[in-house]
Amino acid sequence: PIREWADFDPAEAPDITEERRWSGVAGARERAGDQYLLASGISLYERVHFLRGLENTWTDLYTNPEDLRSLIDILVEMNLYAIKRYQAAEADGFIFCDDWGLQDRLMISPEKWREFWKPAYARVYAAARAAGLQTFLHSCGYITDILPDLIEIGLDVIQMDQQENMGLDNLSRF
């Protein structure tokens, strides 16, 4: 965990390019055959709050925005590398899981989401689509307020477990 930003050293981030991390990807297309091969990326929001803690993550939006952006950028770069590996492995799609919703609203204001997270998602989705991968996001809770943004930046498929709390009629407009 990164309890204090003074303890944060980007050089200590895991080296995602180490070959041992990719041993399970070799032969994935052959094992999948003609089945859809969905590759998993590194969640952006979930990983940040796992590293910083939930309270620190929300506070960082206001008190340490540049440090927060630096951490998000590292995770984006890791995903960009992963996308290249998954493209080479002939994956069909790319997913990560970030639960943005509560039962009846986002956990973050749409404005702060657009300021901090939308640009990061946009970079990942652009790279995935350029690599020929469909983009997927799993997110629980009420996320209607950012669905247009996600679609705008290249999300192809949203997977959710709580669609009833947003109203199926409401979701059908997307």
Language model region names:
Residues D7-F174:
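Active-site loop segments of alpha/beta catalytic cores
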Residues P1-E4:
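Alpha-helix N-cap recognition
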